[in-house]
């Protein structure tokens, strides 16, 4: 487990990696798909962020339900494998309020048209008058820290080692980076699909 210096006096001002816990169809034992790679990937992200930036980064990631009022204390949240997410009405309202109050959610690691369709339907409940926008390679987000020459597709290590391909299923060969924006043009959700 990586460790780094952390000034606990500034714990509430530090960046803290927060994962969204949600209900889904399917999952892993008593945990849903939201639990994939937890807490290792969250800790790795936090460690690398403090290593590569001058940010004060909290060393203990956490997960929160969308209906937990603590979500408003964290401007960045992460959602993994949401292809079969199922939001309650209360979660839809909480997510919408989170975005209206300045929050941002990064969505990652879901594959294929069936998962996209279900995710899209759930997000249309949050954003009934908005459509996700496909982000072109020229978008600044692909050039902020590293100047990317192509949109990366990150496969599971098993697929890469077994088949030498960067997609996980036949209907997931094309990588998509999409986003939802608010009325002011602020990106509120980045969606990494395929």
Predicted feature residues:
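Short, low-complexity, polar/charged sequence segments that are solvent-exposed and flexible
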Residues: 36-41, 96-99, 125-126, 151-154
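An acidic, glycine-rich "communication" segment
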Residues: 28-29, 114-194
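Extracytoplasmic/secreted proteins, especially bacterial periplasmic and envelope-associated proteins
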Residues: 40-44, 48, 90, 94, ...
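Aromatic-Pro/Gly-enriched surface loop or interdomain linker
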Residues: 1-76, 80-83
């Amino acid at each position: 487990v990586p460790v780094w210096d952390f000034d606990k006096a500034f714990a509430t001002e530090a960046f803290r990696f927060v994962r969204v816990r949600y209900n889904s169809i399917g999952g892993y034992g008593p945990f849903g798909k939201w639990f994939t790679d937890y807490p290792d990937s969250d800790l790795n992200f936090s460690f690398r962020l403090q290593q590569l930036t001058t940010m004060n980064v909290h060393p203990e990631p956490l997960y929160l339900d969308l209906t937990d009022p603590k979500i408003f204390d964290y401007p960045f949240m992460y959602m993994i494998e949401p292809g079969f997410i199922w939001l309650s009405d209360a979660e839809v309202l909480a997510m919408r309020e989170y975005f209206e109050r300045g929050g941002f959610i990064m969505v990652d690691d879901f594959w294929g048209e069936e998962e996209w369709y279900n995710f899209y339907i759930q997000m249309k409940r949050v954003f009934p008058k908005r459509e996700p926008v496909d982000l072109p390679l020229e978008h600044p987000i692909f050039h902020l820290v590293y100047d990317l020459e192509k949109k990366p597709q990150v496969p599971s290590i098993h697929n890469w080692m077994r088949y030498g391909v960067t997609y996980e299923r036949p209907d997931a060969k094309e990588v998509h980076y999409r986003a939802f924006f608010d009325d002011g043009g602020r990106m509120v959700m980045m969606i990494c699909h395929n």
